Amino acid sequence: MLSKKKDTQQSCMFLGLEDMLNQKHPMYILANKVDWQMFEDSFSRLYCLDNGRPAKPIRLMVGLLILKHLRNISDESVVEQWSENNYYQYFCGEHVFQPCEPCQASELVHFRNRIGESGIELILKESIRVNGNDSDDSTASIDTTVQEKNITFPTDSKLHRKIIDKCRNIAEKENLPVRQSYTRTLKKLSLDQRFRNHPRNKWKARKADRKEKTIAGRLVRELERNLSPDSRYQSDIDLFKRILNQKKSDKNKIYSVHEPDVQCISKGKEHKKYEFGNKVSIIYTQTTGVIIGALGFRNPYDGHTIEPALEQTERLLGKRTLKTLIGDRGYKGKRQINDTTIEIPKPFNNRKQSQYQKNKLKKQFRKRAAIEPINGHLKTDHRLNRNFYKGITGDNINVMLAAAAFNFKRMMNKWKSSFWLEFKIQIVDLIKAMFYQINNNITRKWAF
């Protein structure tokens, strides 16, 4: 149910947040630039009008999502810091200071699930609109990177131990009979599995791994016998069987029990041979530096990500503005999609090209490398490095929120730098005026 609008009439005894805050602060400016009414109109139809408990204001929830990725903090931290920060409260639509927390951290989870990927895409679209004409660049760079999932490094031993723990929990929850719990056996096996890289312990550890897999299979079969075929745990049992039956050379393996959609991606990095998560595509304007596209995939070939990424960019911009898209050598394939030309580095053997055209392309290829540190900023500053959201939907939500936070941060830095530039100019003018006054006084003093 939608909440009623609060009475914003100011008490005569207290100042409102608008009067207390610095109106040149970037957060204050951003709060007045964002079109909050657009979010109200888009998300209000997702609520019941006359039934249920009144929900939290839509502006509050959208503002908390933006602040979370803008400041790189968790759901719990953003809710806690909101009650301590006047600018956060003004950004989320409050008119007077509120000393209490605005909501429970779990309500952000429900709100993300309510608005879905289309709602998060609206936030990204608004971040592009706030950047104004900077997003109207006809040339952009495209690149893919890996968004790692919040899972441990997968090994067969870890997966089998997880299966054993899950089977025990299900049996305990449903009061099912268990022939043997294997508590002491597993404790001994875990000791044998330690220091497996030592030559003396290698064969002992492998034997312990095989025994652990056997125990996991026994518990799964016993669970299957005791449960009916149409039980709610049937999907879990099928997942356990897939993990136990998969071989080293199989494709589409499962690397996590609680995140079965995780992909193993190798980008050729020396320091990190394999990464476990999903591939994301980023489109970044070359001249102005605005992210105009951020889309999640599984693990396709880079060239196959261009068309869906361009479709999303057209949705976000509302028009086809990209004439040239610059990629690396991994984007071999189509050279033209609709009105957009795809350019990748290659030897300049075409005699039809003039020297001017060759130099122009070389400059664009050099500019394309600027997207690499952008990927780094998205990971370290805006929570793209490790994705804590659940499932494939969580993968797509996280990358779009990170891109939106990057765009908002870009404008905040721009406003901050313009404020300091104006401040420096005023200081210089003041110093010039002081010297001019001193010079006039000296001239007047020594004049005859």
Briefly describe each language-model feature range:
Residues 26-66, 70:
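Basic, short loop/linker segments at the boundary and entry of helix-turn-helix/winged-helix-like folds
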Residues 324-393:
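Helix-centered, glycine/charged polyanion-binding patches within enzymatic domains
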Residues 25, 64, 78-79, 104-108, ...:
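Short, conserved catalytic/metal-binding motifs centered on acidic residues
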Residues 95-261:
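Active-site- or DNA-interface-adjacent structural scaffold in DNA-acting proteins
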Residues 270-316:
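Electropositive, glycine- and tryptophan-enriched low-complexity nucleic-acid-binding patches
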